[in-house]
Curated annotation (Swiss-Prot):
Gene: rpoC
Cofactor note: Binds 1 Mg(2+) ion per subunit.
Name the record gives this protein: DNA-directed RNA polymerase subunit beta'
Keyword annotations: DNA-directed RNA polymerase, Magnesium, Metal-binding, Nucleotidyltransferase, Transcription, Transferase, Zinc
Gene Ontology biological process terms from the UniProt entry: DNA-templated transcription
Length: 1407
């Protein structure tokens, strides 16, 4: 018995480890793992089914086939444990050792490991500095390589063909050494002196200047250093011993009918062993060289196929023409080990079934079919039955349950009480896709789901299925109840708004009961309270919509949180009074005293949560649902064909449009308009007609005429069912009603162009064949798009999760003063997002001052909640600097202050919260709602794009920012700066509108002037760009020679002549180097200086510029000297929707990016080349000028002699995020990405908090490039983790040394995921082979910091409740304590052992 205890103790020992290291295996290492050499390719004997000795399944090497029984049957049972049978050589032990014991094959000739050879960049090639082609030719026995040149003129590593080798042999005899095959490469690798090589390369690096050479050298140095530091030897990349996987991991299973199913690996191993044995035999026989060589090549190919089949040449196929699955295929891809078995496992204690509605459930309940519950909770029931003494053994209990005895159901009730279960609906796009509920037993076979949680699950009842999981341990139940219960997840983690919001029927019911109606039954009554209202409604004395006066008691919270009652008579309706009965204490009556649509209900729940907290909100939500369902049923609202009222005006609107189209057609035929213009106009006419029809229809539906009690006619909001459904937000929208009762409108062809004849019919009238046929395309495209969208969106989510998975809140406050300046989002005249929405739930980075004073309004480090935001709004603050994760100083993870409020809980975020995953889910989950297509702007839209003036909407004062201007002769301001912004400020100092003002715009009102709403404040010519003079004087032409640099053109219509500057391509050779310019001189002919500088005013003219002035004319400042026609770039497609979001997060460079100024200085143009011009920026402080070549066809925004700041736009276009980061810094690029992503989501009406996007941006900015190393051990130009540089610099500065300087890098999310420090995480994401190869060569150590790594090694994740566990481990490790392993006492062990023996181990004695 005491032995047994030892044995049990050995079994309970868990592996304790803190990191995982990956490295190259040396031949000795492989032999030390091995339990014996596999010498034969045989697997099992076909008659006895016993493994062959020394074969691939040999019992002597790998262990016994049956528990505690040797192969020949001499020793059986536990008492012989550990004996090695002298007859068959098998150790008597458990059979599970066949899963862990490895074997090996001694290769007769060394073979290269294909991963280190072919995985680009080739490690062997990089190390030897030889091209991959040459190495392959040596390895596959096509050429020789010189290993030792000796005294000859042959270089080491020189490649020789067969002929060259024979010549060399004749010439030098055995002076030199040249070989072929892997032996040659092995010899080369063995003889390398890594340290020496490293030194030489470093010296070379310091001497060289060429960028490409530097890159190459840095790569080699890094690789060599990796080998030196990790202790890997380069020759280990060539295998001399091949490990053999344990047999139970590559099983051979007999099928019925005498056939066998086998793992492909066995085939691949057999090939290797066969060829290896043949090679050994040939070597023993001293066979001719060519035969041996061929056999060696075959062996090399066999080993390649085993490691990574298909990586080189054709994949080896099995009997069924399918390529065999090699070791590499086992781990990579969706079906590989990582993604199939380690990151996603199937779990026990789970079941799935169809879902149906449970409208009578409470929010925290779900209906669970009895059958399912019985199956899921079986072990608990067995336990209870035994405990009660109702069953003597587990077996008896099992029988009782199978018979479904009455007592079993009682016990099931007990077991289930207070035991939450998890419900999950696939696809689980965000964390609300799994929530916990308390089960209620129901008859039937479908799970019942509470209607209010459908929004979170995105579930409907058209056949959706859901899975149920049972949390077993007490801890799991606790977590399910405290964190995952549906009642704890009322707010959405994406935007902090309620997600438990009524929809559809419930909304319709509440809307119906809160509407009022003129002259309804019972109008004008005065009631004592809501109770009486309900009584008279039930008695039929009053209609639900009757306008009445009711005595209402409201409760308000005072400072102490006590409720204070206010009672008053309110004008309301019967329905609203009845609804007031379910509203919790503490909310004002005004909240229900309106027609409640979906938005209003959502706001109501939100207010309730903020004022009263969780519990009342949950109860209120449930009550609203019950009430809504009840009154929706009472309302009897339904849809009939007569509800779709077609407006009378429709007919005349359509005939008007047809007349206009006919007119355009005539103009086209008489040649007044082009085909393109005609098409665009026709489409505009029909689009306008469609709008008019739908407006007429909505006006018609919206109101109805009724007679009030004084007998007069009155308009009131309509009670049309369809209108009510749309107006309340229950179902449908104006656009859909338009198709039912208006006209369907314009349709698109499959290629995306619009068909110019619209469908004038609607669905009520019905479509004719042609109209139906036109419609089919759109319908199909919709379905196809949806399928594509789902896949794309899922992939985006996966990449986002992968890049952000290891970001966890790790400390309370990092203490940084950095932050982002938040301002309201204003586009043109609309506030798209007020400041309040942007800063709510953030922490201030510095004190917020009261505008215009020095008083502190909000102190630094304040979490801005609703009350603070009210204060900011009251004092009209329009910019707040808040903390952001992008500027957080925490090394691993972020701090709670930089993140701010946990949106789903409403308080500051807890430590250990996995904000990275939450951010990824919040951005990815609405992905399916985004569009997939790129938008073609055509027709009406493109003409609207050419704006030519700014018209303000509100009154206020104008504020111009970064503006340079001059006053022209008529006293108006003319803008001469490039990126001027015009803001409209109201009387409280808040920004209401904001516009971009182009160069050359003439301002009607100046900075700080008051304007009225609707006033035009600036206008300009949209088609030409002017050149504006900043000084007055006389014009002097320079280098303007007719026929060489300019040509004179006369306009046919007006007879005015103008000078046109020739493009350099059109000039004669003499004119190529001339620079036409206009110089401004005073009356004496002296240069006039530009005010504020010592530069003479001269304006160089680019090609195509038009000058309408003559030499010597007097001009005044602000006049237009020349005009440059702008080519309208046609209609540009804007990428929208998902592809745009993906481009932003992948940080892809746009096709023709904007060109930004690299440094500040004065612009000039140098010598031009064929297709490019040379832009030179000379800094004012006299340091080196910066030059850049720009293609001629790019329109430049700057003139010669103009001053630019770093990061200014030189040529328009979409900005590349990398440039923004380099020139304007981290905050600018964050702002850019956040705003651009938000624009896409805002267009679809999806709300996502900025925080989530910032979290992803932080992960994209993880890396930095070292510019100068200082005293650190980084290499120049090396890319390292930003946190590592920070930590290293901190240590160096503490010791008074010079730190490294670096620049931050922006990586796309895929790149960033693969560049993470953790190789396990990267390997399980994409490009598994490459990641593992790199990691092995560098001998990387994975510290298991992220979530993914910990899931893969099967540990609690370092987030959430696992965070404390990991913190505790770290503490203990730091203190150097032993980590406690669960000790088994002798008593426990013997007791459990006895039970084991009774249960079945001991049953085999009496055979």
């Amino acid at each position: 018995m005491k032995d047994l205890l030892k044995f049990l103790k050995a079994q309970t020992k868990t592996e304790e480890f803190d990191a995982i290291k990956i490295a190259l295996a040396s031949p000795d290492m492989i032999r030390s793992w091995s339990f014996g050499e596999v010498k034969k390719p045989e697997t099992i004997n076909y008659r006895t089914f016993k493994p062959e000795r020394d074969g691939l399944f040999c019992a002597r090497i790998f262990g016994p086939v049956k528990d505690y029984e040797c192969l020949c049957g001499k020793y059986k049972r536990l008492k012989h444990r550990g004996v090695i049978c002298e007859k068959c050589g098998v150790e008597v032990t458990q059979t599970k050792v066949r899963r862990e014991r490895m074997g090996h094959i001694e290769l007769a000739s060394p073979t290269a490991h294909i991963w280190f050879l072919k995985s680009l960049p080739s490690r062997i090639g990089l190390l030897l500095d030889m091209p991959l082609r040459d190495i392959e030719r040596v390895l596959y026995f096509e050429s020789y390589v010189v290993i030792e040149g000796g005294m000859t003129n042959l270089e080491r590593q020189q490649i020789l063909t067969e002929e060259q080798y024979l010549d060399a042999l004749e010439e030098f005899g055995d002076e030199f050494d040249a070989k072929m095959g892997a032996e040659a490469i092995q010899a080369l690798l063995k003889s390398m002196d890594l340290e020496q090589e490293c030194e030489t390369l470093r010296e070379e690096l310091n001497e060289t200047n060429s960028e490409t050479k530097r890159k190459k050298l840095t790569k080699r140095i890094k690789l060599l250093e990796a080998f030196v530091q990790s202790g890997n030897k380069p020759e280990w990349m060539i295998l001399t011993v091949l490990p053999v996987l344990p047999p139970d991991l590559r099983p051979l299973v007999p099928l019925d009918g005498g056939r066998f199913a086998t793992s492909d690996l066995n085939d691949l191993y057999r090939r290797v062993i066969n060829r290896n044995n043949r090679l050994k035999r040939l070597l023993d026989l001293a066979a001719p060289d060519i035969i041996v060589r061929n056999e060696k090549r075959m062996l090399q190919e066999a080993v390649d196929a085993l490691l990574d089949n298909g990586r080189r040449g054709r994949a080896i196929t099995g009997s069924n023409k399918r390529p065999l699955k090699s070791l590499a295929d086992m781990i990579k891809g969706k079906q590989g080990r990582f993604r199939q078995n380690l990151l996603g496992k199937r779990v026990d204690y789970s079941g799935r079934s169809v879902i149906t509605v449970g409208p009578y459930l409470r929010l925290h309940q779900c209906g669970l079919p009895k059958k399912m519950a019985l199956e899921l909770f079986k072990p608990f029931i067995y336990g209870k039955l035994e405990l009660r003494g109702l069953a003597t053994t587990i077996k008896a209990a099992k029988k009782m349950v199978e018979r479904e005895e009455a007592v079993v159901w009682d016990i099931l009730d007990e077991v289930i009480r207070e035991h939450p279960v998890l419900l999950n609906r696939a696809p689980t796009l965000h964390r609300l896709g799994i929530q916990a509920f308390e089960p209620v037993l129901i008859e039937g076979k479908a799970i019942q789901l509470h209607p209010l949680v459908c929004a979170a699950y995105n579930a409907d009842f058209d056949g959706d299925q859901m899975a149920v999981h049972v949390p077993l341990t007490l801890e799991a139940q606790l977590e399910a109840r405290a964190l995952m219960m549906s009642t704890n997840n009322i707010l959405s983690p994406a935007n902090g708004e309620p997600i438990i919001v009524p929809s559809q029927d419930v909304v319709l019911g509440l809307y119906y009961m809160t509407r009022d109606c003129v002259n309804a039954k019972g109008e004008g009554m005065v009631l004592t309270g809501p109770k009486e209202a309900e009584r008279i409604y039930r008695a039929g004395l009053a209609s639900l919509h009757a306008r009445v006066k009711v005595r209402i008691t409201e409760y308000e919270k005072d400072e102490n949180g006590e409720f204070v009652a206010h009672t008053s008579l309110k004008d309301t309706t019967v329905g609203r009074a009845i609804l007031w009965m379910i509203v919790p204490k503490g909310l004002p009556f005004s909240i229900v005293n309106q027609a409640l649509g979906k938005k209003a209900i959502s706001k109501m729940l939100n207010t309730c949560y903020r004022i009263l907290g969780l519990k009342p909100t949950v109860i209120f939500a449930d009550q609203t649902m019950y009430t809504g369902f009840a009154y929706a049923a009472r309302s009897g609202a339904s849809v009939g064909i007569d509800d779709m009222v077609i407006p009378e005006k429709k007919h005349e609107i359509i005939s008007e449009a047809e007349a206009e189209v006919a007119e355009i057609q005539e103009q086209f035929q008489s040649g007044l308009v082009t085909a393109g213009e005609r098409y665009n106009k026709v489409i505009d006419i029909w689009a306008a007609a469609n709008d008019r029809v739908s407006k007429a229809m909505m006006d018609n539906l919206q109101t109805e005429t009724v007679i009030n009690r004084d007998g007069q006619e009155e308009q009131q909001v309509s009670f049309n069912s369809i209108y009510m459904m749309a107006d309340s937000g229950a179902r449908g929208s104006a656009a859909q009603i338009r198709q039912l009762a208006g006209m369907r409108g314009l349709m698109a062809k499959p290629d995306g162009s619009i068909i110019e004849t619209p469908i004038t019919a609607n669905f009520r009238e019905g479509l004719n064949v042609l109209q139906y046929f036109i419609s089919t395309h759109g319908a199909r495209k919709g379905l196809a798009d949806t399928a594509l969208k789902t896949a794309n969106s899922g992939y985006l989510t996966r990449r986002l999760v992968d890049v952000a998975q290891d970001l966890v809140v790790t400390e309370d406050d990092c203490g940084t003063h950095e932050g982002i300046l938040m301002t309201p989002v204003i586009e043109g005249g609309d506030v798209k997002e007020p400041l309040r929405d942007r800063v709510l739930g953030r922490v201030t980075a510095e004190d917020v001052l009261n505008p215009g004073t020095a008083d502190i309004l909000v102190p630094r480090n304040t979490l801005l909640h609703e009350q603070w935001c009210d204060l900011l709004e009251a004092n009209s603050v329009d910019a707040v600097k808040v903390r952001s994760v992008v500027s957080c100083d925490t090394d691993f993870g972020v701090c709670a202050h930089c993140y701010g409020r946990d949106l789903a809980r409403g308080h500051i975020i807890n430590k250990g919260e996995a904000i990275g995953v939450i951010a990824a889910q919040s951005i990815g989950e609405p992905g399916t709602q985004l569009t997939m297509r790129t938008f073609h702007i055509g027709g009406a839209a493109s003409r609207a794009a050419a704006e030519s003036s700014i018209q303000v909407k509100n009154k206020g004062s104008i504020k111009l920012s970064n503006v340079k201007s001059v006053v022209n002769s008529s006293g108006k301001l003319v803008i001469t700066s490039r990126n001027t912004e015009l803001k409209l400020i109201d009387e409280f100092g808040r920004t209401k509108e904001s516009y971009k003002v182009p160069y050359g715009a003439v301002m009607a009102k100046g900075d700080g002037e008051q304007v009225a709403g609707g006033e035009t404040v600036a206008n300009w010519d949209p088609h030409t760009m002017p050149v504006i003079t900043e000084v007055s004087g006389f014009i002097r032409f320079t280098d303007m020679i007719d026929g060489q640099t300019i040509t004179r053109q006369t306009d046919e219509l007006t007879g005015l002549s103008s000078l046109v500057v020739l493009d350099s391509a059109e000039r004669t050779t003499g004119g190529k180097d001339l620079r036409p310019a206009l110089k401004i001189v005073d009356a004496q002919g002296n240069d006039v200086l530009i005010p504020g500088t010592d530069m003479p005013a001269q304006y160089f003219l680019p090609g195509k510029a038009i000058v309408q002035l003559e030499d010597g004319v007097q001009i005044s400042s602000g006049d237009t000297l020349a005009r440059i026609p702008q080519e309208s770039g046609g209609t540009k497609d804007i990428t929208g929707g998902l592809p745009r979001v993906a481009d932003l997060f992948e940080a892809r460079r746009p096709k023709e990016p904007a060109i930004l100024a690299e440094i500040a200085g004065i612009v000039s143009f140098g010598k031009e080349t064929k297709g490019k011009r040379r832009l030179v920026i000379t800094p004012v402080d006299g340091s080196d000028p910066y030059e850049e070549m720009i293609p001629k066809w790019r329109q430049l925004n700057v003139f010669e002699g103009e001053r630019v700041e770093r990061g200014d736009v030189i040529s328009d276009g979409p900005e590349a995020p990398h440039d923004i980061l380099r020139l304007r810094g981290v905050h600018a690029v964050t702002r850019y990405i956040v705003n651009e992503v938000q624009d896409v989501y805002r267009l679809q009406g999806v709300k996502i908090n900025d925080k989530h996007i910032e979290v992803i941006v932080r992960q994209m900015l993880r890396k930095a490039t070292i510019e100068s190393a200082g005293s650190s051990d980084f290499l120049e130009g090396e890319q390292v983790e930003y946190s590592r540089v920070k930590i290293a610099n901190r240590e160096l500065e503490a010791n008074g040394k010079v730190g490294a300087t670096f620049s931050r890098d922006l990586l796309g999310i895929t790149k960033a995921s693969l560049a993470t420090e953790s190789f396990i995480s990267a390997a399980s994401f994409q490009e598994t082979t490459r990641v593992l190869t790199e990691a092995a060569v560098a001998g990387k150590r994975d510290e298991l910091r992220g979530l993914k790594e910990n899931v893969i090694v099967g540990r609690l994740i370092p987030a959430g409740t696992g965070y404390a566990y990991h913190q505790d481990r770290m503490r203990r490790r730091a203190a150097g304590e032993q980590l406690a392993t669960p000790q088994v006492t002798a008593e426990d062990a013997s007791a459990s052992l006895a039970e084991l023996l009774n249960a079945g181990l001991g049953g085999s004695d009496n055979e």
